[in-house]
Amino acid sequence: MSTLAEVYTIIEDAEQECRKGDFTNAKAKYQEAIEVLGPQNENLSQNKLSSDVTQAIDLLKQDITAKIQELELLIEKQSSEENNIGMVNNNMLIGSVILNNKSPINGISNARNWDNPAYQDTLSPINDPLLMSILNRLQFNLNNDIQLKTEGGKNSKNSEMKINLRLEQFKKELVLYEQKKFKEYGMKIDEITKENKKLANEIGRLRERWDSLVESAKQRRDKQKN
């Protein structure tokens, strides 16, 4: 049956997309398979098929529909993960800029660059409470240190030393923050990988079930002919 062969090909394409982690394309392929199996297809018109084959096709549709629903959940989860990873990459860029800036801080203007609108696009969006806490604490301490330096000019060296210590502490906190985030995202990626493997196993089960149903239908038809 050429139409079912086409469906098999589409399902195989969907499996490949799943293995690559492209759940959006996999979903589109399964939806295409549903359309091919739709009632508008003359080659699969129920009045031309035996009840066993018709039942097998209905079961196949149900299984494919279930896979589409699972993929929708995975797509939603994947989209959420990508947004979060994008946020972390943005935050890591901020940290890299600060870590790579080894020039001494002299004057209030340098410490208050974060208030400059030109830097807002770089810093936003920062929605992570932990990172916000680290950045706000650093900014608060730097502003205080620089103010003390300005008011007591004789102790400028001590003030600069304090500022450098603040930056060293910030580097350590940022490293711990990034390690924590990478661990969290690693766990989430493992979870998605397990879901992907589960989906691939269910696809294999679906194929075996379909083959069994078709074989059973053939045997019944042969018995009726004999």
From Swiss-Prot:
Residues 52-85, 182-209 form a coiled coil. It comes from the Eukaryota. One of its GO terms (cellular component) is phagophore assembly site membrane. The modification N-acetylserine is found at residue 2. It is a peripheral membrane protein. Homodimer. Component of the autophagy-specific VPS34 PI3-kinase complex I composed of VPS15, VPS30, VPS34, ATG14 and an ATG38 homodimer. Interacts directly with ATG14 and VPS34. Belongs to the ATG38 family. The N-terminal region (residues 2-83) bridges the coiled-coil I regions of ATG14 and VPS30 in the base of complex I. Autophagy-related protein required for cytoplasm to vacuole transport (Cvt) and autophagy as a part of the autophagy-specific VPS34 PI3-kinase complex I. This complex is essential to recruit the ATG8-phosphatidylinositol conjugate and the ATG12-ATG5 conjugate to the pre-autophagosomal structure. ATG38 is required for the integrity of the active PI3-kinase complex I by maintaining an association between VPS15-VPS34 and ATG14-VPS30 subcomplexes. This is PtdIns3K complex I subunit atg38. It comes from Saccharomyces cerevisiae (strain ATCC 204508 / S288c).
